[in-house]
């Protein structure tokens, strides 16, 4: 607590106007409880002095904000007189500071809100989840519930406060309590340190209430294990705290958020981070969570508090953000670096069988000098990757089936209807028919490609679509159309890497007409215009005449070597096709399918 308190005192507080408003509100409440406890009277006089100081201060925010923590019984403790018991400066310190400043403003607004709505509550701990359920803060209205054992004792920090301390507040406003606190607290608030707080009541003087509030907070995480809780009211009214915390639905309500020990503010296990910079194991009440914005209005579902304790009282050293969840202090084992030989052996074994028996796994591990667990983990990861790739292959097959159905239904590409260049595409289809390659051949080849890719367990790049509906215009310059009809139909195979070349040759050989092709040349050789690529919606315009598309030396050039063709070279000006490629990036020349294909080459390396 000392540590987080001192951090919070370094953050500039709200201007004294807000303070004076808060104190003005507090000074309107009577405190009959004070007449029972000299220590608390002392605190109350301190509070009034402090209040006068705050009202006399100039509007500039004080350098060290002596923020006031108002306990249930009205006792105040100034947070400025505590020193950190640890010199390390951690990132949590910064977090605590900024969060404190932000939540301090928010809390002041909540004080104002409750002041206006006449809630009889001495400690207006910040509204639950942004003040949405202010009704749960009405802790002094005299409902007749008894505090759990130890709650009042540890909470108020006076020697032995009478249990109905929180009933003694006269009901100065007739505001009824809309939500009777009928929810029992998940765990009775039993504080192991209650005897410390009670014993040191007279001796500790000023620090008693603060220490007790720290105790209250320090074990709040243990006391409120799983239910959705809201920060409740005063340290002495531990019962009221418990009931309203259980009642408020899931609010990550902020504690008083000013001075680090918001009296009795329950620490939300589910709030985002609680600025606790102490080691959680220290028995001092110091690791009270929470300084400004101890329970934040942030994420109700993220990790539990930095220094929270689980139900057994064991400290949970969890990280402050969700990516350091659970036991972040536990060292993660480094990734296993496999050698090439190990990887090759594992891959071969995986190709043979996707699942290993225990005996096979042990043999493989022994052979590769790996542990059994490493082989098992590698196989699990490899199976996951394999399933993902198979899913992609099946997806491609399904899309190929849809595409074929469209083509059979409409006799053309489904993507062409909306384009103004449909006539060019129709001409392309006609040219394809004239050259003897029907669209169905290319579709069948596409089926085979996708099937081969799925069988090879290597995902096809989506760019494969760029060559899909190559309707096979089959324009080889100086070459008869017949031998090249199947070649242009299968030219989309050039978008596959050499890994698929055997499948490509088989697919082309299955085609009627012509010997199986060499490794497919660039599809620009086939001047496959007129048909779109479905994925990008690109139109590859049709080359106007059977001999007009490409320069004569082009067909012999292999795919990867062909540079992007400049526009005048790519198409003679007499071609009827559009001069722009509607969906393509601006840098790509219009008819150079070769460039598109070489792009596919680049992207296929998985």
From Swiss-Prot:
Listed Basic and acidic residues bias regions: 297-314
Keyword DNA damage among UniProt keywords: no
Leader sequence residues: none
Polar residues: compositionally biased ranges: 1-14, 315-325
Biased composition (Pro residues): 513-522, 561-576
GO biological process, one term: eye pigment granule organization
Location within or outside the cell: Nucleus
DNA-binding region residue numbers: 331-390
Gly residues compositional bias, start-end: 286-295
Composition bias type Basic residues, residue spans: 21-40, 108-118, 166-188
GO molecular function: DNA-binding transcription factor activity, RNA polymerase II-specific; RNA polymerase II cis-regulatory region sequence-specific DNA binding
Coiled coil: none
InterPro entries given in the database record: HD, Homeobox_CS, Homeobox_NK-like, Homeodomain-like_sf
Keywords: Developmental protein, DNA-binding, Homeobox, Nucleus, Sensory transduction, Vision
Positions of the UniProt region annotated as Disordered: 1-65, 104-188, 261-340, 508-606
Tissue specificity remark: Abundant in the eye-antenna imaginal disk.
Ranges of biased composition (kind: Low complexity): 41-65, 119-138, 523-534
GO cellular component term, pick one: nucleus
Biased composition, class Acidic residues, residue ranges: 266-284
Family under the similarity heading: Belongs to the Antp homeobox family.
Protein's job: Functionally required in R1 and R6 receptor cells and primary pigment cells for normal eye development.
Protein's UniProt name: Homeobox protein B-H1
